[in-house]
Amino acid sequence: MVQQTNNAENTEALLAGESSDSGAGLELGIASSPTPGSTASTGGKADDPSWCKTPSGHIKRPMNAFMVWSQIERRKIMEQSPDMHNAEISKRLGKRWKLLKDSDKIPFIREAERLRLKHMADYPDYKYRPRKKVKSGNANSSSSAAASSKPGEKGDKVGGSGGGGHGGGGGGGSSNAGGGGGGASGGGANSKPAQKKSCGSKVAGGAGGGVSKPHAKLILAGGGGGGKAAAAAAASFAAEQAGAAALLPLGAAADHHSLYKARTPSASASASSAASASAALAAPGKHLAEKKVKRVYLFGGLGTSSSPVGGVGAGADPSDPLGLYEEEGAGCSPDAPSLSGRSSAASSPAAGRSPADHRGYASLRAASPAPSSAPSHASSSASSHSSSSSSSGSSSSDDEFEDDLLDLNPSSNFESMSLGSFSSSSALDRDLDFNFEPGSGSHFEFPDYCTPEVSEMISGDWLESSISNLVFTY
């Protein structure tokens, strides 16, 4: 006891001698009466074994050097200007502590070290356990889970069932796979902690491993119980896309919604078969409705198998750069050829790689540099769409289709663009087509990070060719 008070006097002398900020008010010192709830370790509290405990029995951490210093300085500021708000005092204290020289901080660092050693002596079995913030009101299960889980891991998020599954992530719930690092939920099929929608896509993890893409707002199902999460995602998108789906014909709407489910691995096979079925449904009525519907598709709407970009399509082979690029072109242009093309290729592999398919891809790439070439995107992808559906049973040839498209042209600009993109001797083709082989790598192999909202905006009305439609009226 005597030694500790001597210690306190020594520190007071040091503080008076060395601290430039402290001035005449230092007789308050560390040994004087502390503010209520503070952890000053000298004076009457030195022999009290509960000097660091709150009334509820929680053991507080020992003060660091800044806390030792700011406790003294805060008291002085509160005496000088009692009306100052607490947050303003803290802001000023932080600025002043940063401006302090290291030599001025030494006595406070020593005092903090002394407090730390005393804390270790008084509470030998103390362990720092930060309180877990649990959304629901089950405080009991969270405390038992905190005892069972490792206390040092800040990324743990305690599940409701006694700490069984922890959805990993950066502390505070920002656990997309890029930042947090551990985006898979650990225990069994306990997907409750991971389905918080605060940050993009989450993983409802199945058997331990899940895949998280940080772009689309999809809840990817990573294993066995994938169907429910996929259905929930499709239902949430159905509300957003209701206006867009109203424009589509019947088969196209089914195709449109099956595409959302196709983003999950468990539902991809059924979605590809559904896509081929709806393409086959839409094919007979296509010739009748083509001339009426095509103008809407070319210039305002979504195509007969419109793809909201969420990644690589269902039937597409991820290792095939051509399929990847066609998916991206499909997301950026109103018509999406490659899903029906891919599904027909899945049913008959020989029919998948027709030359017209290559040609549509070449014209897609040829049309991309020009800013006014969005209608030509639509025409070229529509041509490859018709070629893939003709390989699966419809009998339209590319020449008829070109004539139809040229009849439909509203402007000479579009006519020249589509002619230029369809003639294989154009300079754009010669520039861009030199490395175009089915197996060769392409520099367009990046994944597509469009969210459904962005792709809806891209495929929306700003692709109109007349300038009056580009004026926003809202």
Swiss-Prot record:
Localisation per UniProt entry: Nucleus
Q: Which UniProt keywords apply?
A: Acetylation, Activator, Disease variant, DNA-binding, Intellectual disability, Nucleus, Transcription, Transcription regulation
Q: Where is the composition biased (Gly residues)?
A: 158-189
- Compositionally biased spans, kind Polar residues: 1-10
Which residues, as ranges, make up the DNA-binding region of this protein?
59-127
Alphabetical list of SMART domains matching this protein: HMG (SM00398)
Q: What is its main location?
A: nucleus
For the region Disordered, give the residue spans: 1-58, 128-228, 262-286, 302-416
One GO BP annotation here? glial cell development
**Residues bearing PTM N6-acetyllysine:** K95
Q: Which disease is this protein implicated in?
A: Intellectual developmental disorder with speech delay and dysmorphic facies: An autosomal dominant disorder characterized by mild to severe intellectual disability, global developmental delay, mild but distinct facial dysmorphism, fifth finger clinodactyly, and small stature. Hypotonia, ventricular septal defect, and spastic quadriparesis may also be present.
- Role played: Transcriptional activator that binds with high affinity to the T-cell enhancer motif 5'-AACAAAG-3' motif. Required for IL17A-producing Vgamma2-positive gamma-delta T-cell maturation and development, via binding to regulator loci of RORC to modulate expression. Involved in skeletal myoblast differentiation by promoting gene expression of CALD1.
Assembly and partners are described as: Interacts with UBE2I. Interacts with HDAC1; interaction inhibits the transcriptional activator activity.
> What is said about the domains?
The 9aaTAD motif is a transactivation domain present in a large number of yeast and animal transcription factors.
Q: What is this protein called?
A: Transcription factor SOX-4
